[in-house]
């Protein structure tokens, strides 16, 4: 839902890469090349960034029920 702060598997901090990764991929660059240039080498970290879906915009449309 929110940006991944750390890799779910190894715990490496990833939040500092998210904005640049997202903007470059939305600009049409190859995600593989972007991750290589950012220095994200571990496959678990790459998976965490590639698989993230920013669903917070969809979820916040719903009314909060307690």
Swiss-Prot record:
Keyword Transcription in annotation: yes
Enzyme class: transferase
Molecular function as annotated in GO: DNA binding; DNA-directed RNA polymerase activity; zinc ion binding
GO cellular component: cytoplasm; DNA-directed RNA polymerase complex
The reaction(s) this protein catalyses: RNA(n) + a ribonucleoside 5'-triphosphate = RNA(n+1) + diphosphate
Keyword Cytoplasm: yes
Enzyme Commission number(s) of this protein: 2.7.7.6
Binding site for Zn(2+): 7, 10, 44-45
Key words of the record: Cytoplasm, DNA-directed RNA polymerase, Metal-binding, Nucleotidyltransferase, Transcription, Transferase, Zinc
Pfam family, one: RNA_pol_N
Cofactor: Zn(2+)
A single GO BP: DNA-templated transcription
Stretches of the chain forming a coiled coil according to its record: none
Role played: DNA-dependent RNA polymerase (RNAP) catalyzes the transcription of DNA into RNA using the four ribonucleoside triphosphates as substrates.
Assembly with partners or alone: Part of the RNA polymerase complex.
Family: Belongs to the archaeal Rpo10/eukaryotic RPB10 RNA polymerase subunit family.
UniProt-recorded name of the protein: DNA-directed RNA polymerase subunit Rpo10
Species annotation: Hyperthermus butylicus (strain DSM 5456 / JCM 9403 / PLM1-5)
């Amino acid at each position: 839902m929110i940006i991944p702060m750390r890799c779910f598997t190894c715990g490496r901090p990833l939040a500092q890469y998210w904005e640049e990764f997202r903007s470059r991929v939305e600009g049409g660059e190859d995600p593989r090349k972007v991750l290589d240039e950012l220095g994200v080498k571990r496959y678990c970290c790459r998976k965490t960034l590639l698989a993230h879906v920013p669903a917070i915009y969809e979820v916040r449309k719903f009314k909060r029920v307690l």
